[in-house]
Amino acid sequence: MPKLKTKSAVKKRFKLTASGKVIASQAGKKHFMRRRTKAQIRNLRGTTILCPQDRYNIKKYFLPYGIN
């Protein structure tokens, strides 16, 4: 049986930590930034850890070898 391929889009958007958590960048920073306050823009920097249900879905359906 051939190896399962990882979805390319998921490879670019998410990373797995050593403990099995999924890291993603904050959503909502592409456009419409003028209407946001400086604090809102600042809080969108960096990355966030996905909630357990989203983590499960990403690992199960898109990262075939990501489930520990």
UniProtKB/Swiss-Prot annotation:
InterPro entries attached to this UniProt entry: Ribosomal_bL35, Ribosomal_bL35-like, Ribosomal_bL35_CS, Ribosomal_bL35_sf
Keywords: Ribonucleoprotein, Ribosomal protein
Family from the record: Belongs to the bacterial ribosomal protein bL35 family.
GO CC terms of this entry: cytosolic large ribosomal subunit
A Gene Ontology BP annotation from the UniProt entry: translation
Name of this chain's protein: Large ribosomal subunit protein bL35
Organism: Rickettsia conorii (strain ATCC VR-613 / Malish 7)
Molecular function terms, GO-annotated: structural constituent of ribosome
Pfam families: Ribosomal_L35p
Spans through the membrane: none
